[in-house]
């Protein structure tokens, strides 16, 4: 399948940037700034637009460009259009449906990536994509944002964790270290699921997972080695 020329990602990137600006605008409104409201529910859409709109578009676009498959440009398109429709027509479900389809496409992209390379970092990012899809499905079926935001958080946390694992592969973590990481991720995801039924316990358990992930990274992230590198550029990139 032919790849898109380099100029084609630009419209998707514009949608992502506009999504970021809309999310920031909504965030400032939630902080109490007296800004003109584009729609009556803009402030309430801060989280969905920031995560599913801006970051959803950007992350899926990055993978589409890297994989060079035409069909992979559909998720960032759906995500970019989804946040826009959600803002313009806040009382209609079309925006949520588009964002949910975008996250389904994100899972499809990660499925292909895992098929090509079955590794700890790809599985971690795949779980993040599944969490994104789960959160959007719950939102579409009427769950409150304060409940589904845990799944959106997992999307970002596991995506970043997976990318850090990919960068740190040269350190070759032992099998025991990988098992420990998997156990920590299990704790984190269990807390997120539990939060749907018991918010306090779920918050505490997922919070424990959030603490353990960076603690695990203290020993296994290449950044801690490169930050002491003799070359300034390497330290800066870290």
Where in the sequence are the language-model features?
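Hydrophobic alpha-helical transmembrane segments of multi-pass integral membrane proteins
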Residues: 1-238
